[in-house]
């Protein structure tokens, strides 16, 4: 089974993050939402709280077939500020 991580940070665009999760899960992909905020509850760009499946520190980024970074402000800035995520993206092949 294919595996995907959708990385969430405070201020992410809810439609961009959650639609991807919905469509991929319907297609049979093992999708995990990953918080880069150090806590599972993330606040979307439109103040919608979302509980991530897992924290960034608890994933093995090498086992994913797909990495998804939703847009939104300030979500993209919060993703960019996460050193571990930046390192993972640079190493991802």
Language model features with spans:
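Extended, subdomain-level signal for the structured scaffold at the beginning of enzyme domains
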Residues: 1-92
């Amino acid at each position: 089974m294919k595996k995907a991580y959708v990385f969430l940070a405070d201020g992410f665009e809810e439609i961009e993050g959650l639609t991807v999760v919905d469509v991929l899960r319907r297609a049979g992909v093992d999708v995990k939402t990953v918080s880069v905020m150090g806590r599972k509850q993330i606040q979307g760009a439109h103040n919608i709280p979302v509980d991530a499946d897992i924290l960034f520190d608890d994933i093995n980024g090498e086992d994913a077939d797909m990495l998804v970074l939703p847009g939104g402000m300030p979500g993209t800035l919060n993703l960019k500020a996460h050193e571990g995520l930046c390192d993972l993206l640079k190493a991802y092949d």
